[in-house]
Amino acid sequence: MTPRQDTPLPIRIGTGERGGTFYTQGLALKAALKRIPHAPDIEVVESSAGVSIENANRLEAGEIDFGFIAAPWVVAAKQGTAPFTRAIDIRVAAPMNLGPNFFIARADSGLRKVSDLRGRRVAVGMKDGGMAPHAEGVFAALGIGPDDLDRVYVDFAEGAEMLATGTVDAQFQCPIPNRVMSELSERILVRVLTYDPPHLDAALKVIPHDRRIIMRKGAVRGLDQDVPQLGVLNLLVTHARLDAATVQRVVGAIILAAADLGRLDPLFAGLAELIETFRGERQAADFGGAGLHPGALRAYQG
């Protein structure tokens, strides 16, 4: 007779490519929640495809319980628009971080602004990932068409290597601090490309739920002034079918662990303030119909 298993299964959280920002945040979540009494055990699940938008499809398939996704792709998943082929009944659990997506070039290049990318080779991320369509939103806002630059579809690490060796002229980077960006800036001097104010305004109109954010002087080696950039809000999401008690338990533990998470991973700095914006129903309507899961609402109102 098979003995009864009393140990609950761990909560599976889908992240991104190994070593990427979502993956390291997932590891920090696992570590922080271990310190919270009665919090569930966490299994960090990397993306086999190296892309975080895969998490929406894995939620639909029941392969994970929660997943990291940037806010614009939460909207796309809920509404079934590109890059998704069908609507997914996704729900928001918690904010994870707000950070800049930004273009970098070698400091010894002639590139200074995003508009200078015309005619250049740019590493924009994986073709089926979240970064590439984000970059396309920027290009569209600036009137940069399909034939105006050469898009190179590679992961963050390969894109950084290509920039270091001069194989590409620029790279679209994810929020800092991240290991790839830190290691690259120690190898070569880089320049963060800036936006003309009308171009940044146009990009904010094109890309839903991005926010203006200030990238502070010294945030990466060689950045010698504060510069406004596109800020992406990254979210922890789940499927509508996941039971409210489980969601409430996970979100409640994240709320309790917010300060600890900020110490474990600088990407979580400011998490407590972001959580406060989720303590009302108005924020829940901000993601294209993908509102807060009922269990998350209970956690915020508890």
Positions of PLM-derived features:
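Extracytoplasmic
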Residues: 8, 51, 61, 87-88, ...
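Bilobed "Venus flytrap"/periplasmic-binding protein-like clamshell domains
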Residues: 8-36, 42-49, 99-165, 265, ...
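Divalent cation-coordinating acidic motifs and surrounding scaffolds
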Residues: 43, 48-67
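Pocket-lining segment of extracytoplasmic ligand-binding domains
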Residues: 71-73, 81-82, 109, 146-243
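Ligand-binding clefts/hinges and TM-proximal coupling segments of bilobed small-molecule sensing domains
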Residues: 121-137, 209-279
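An extracytoplasmic/periplasmic, membrane-proximal ligand-sensing/linker region
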Residues: 154, 158, 165-166, 175-188, ...
